[in-house]
Amino acid sequence: MDDSPIKNWIPYKLTNDNDGPQCHWLNTFKETFTEPFFDGTIRKCRSIDSQHLLKNCVSDLAMLEEWAESLPDVEPNAIIFHTSRCGSTLVSQLLSLSSQNIVLSEVPFFDDLLRMRYKYPINELELLKLFRAAVKFYAQKRTGHEEHLYIKTDSWHMFFYEQLRQIYPTVPIILMYRDPNEVYRSLKKVPGMQSVAGMIEPELLGFEPKEIAGLHPDEYLASVLEKFLAQYHHIIKSDGDFLLLNYNEPPLKMVKKITEISNTSLTPQHLTFMEERVQFHSKKPGELFSEVQGPASLPLLNKAIDLYHSLNERT
């Protein structure tokens, strides 16, 4: 497969035209996936593309399954869900320090596929097949060292738990979370898509359309955090292969727990790399990490706080 014309290529963007969904392709040139978020990897690879004067490569989405069939790839060792601002970015960065690990951190194309039902009519079974095929491209054995695969989803992908569990019935689910007061303050300071009404389809998050009409932005954010934690409770009632990780645990301890449940191991060299990396900011690797404690709990977070404490009783 080393001489395959699609080796190192990934589907990175989904668009629509009169013929239906179109898949845009990107050559990764054996670049390692070590950016905090995968859109950073895409920018890096597109820059290399422009230097090679490559043309835009587009195909019908249906080709995804056919082309993925013969790819040598790595099966997932764990799927990481998170409630935002809870240490998942740092954990994924620490995991990516090993050349044996492929870490896919919030891949835009995965989000395009999972939310495609809100834009295009598509059969659920076909969508699951497309998602599995897409993962195979991202999980290619491109250097020969890859043995483990970790998929860190976008925060709202926890609501696709049932679909992802259908695709990967035996893969451990990691549930990362944090005190809602701290998540709320962080998202107020630097908003994410999930914290702004209308950016993510309300029904995906479990809202009725009328439920969010007229909500103040602060109330909306508090409701989203409540929905996230309620979904975690649903998952742990439905699934027997999960790991709850609270942000208040040391990052290295969290990584060790993830490797244990995913039946992987840490080499002495990987541990050394992690001990160095953990001193720095997860999203800004060159910046030393520091954290300022905020004010006491807000009343609008009371329901989320109750759900948070209930989760703590399960760890």
Residue positions per predicted region:
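PAPS-dependent sulfotransferase catalytic domain
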Residues: 3-234, 249, ...
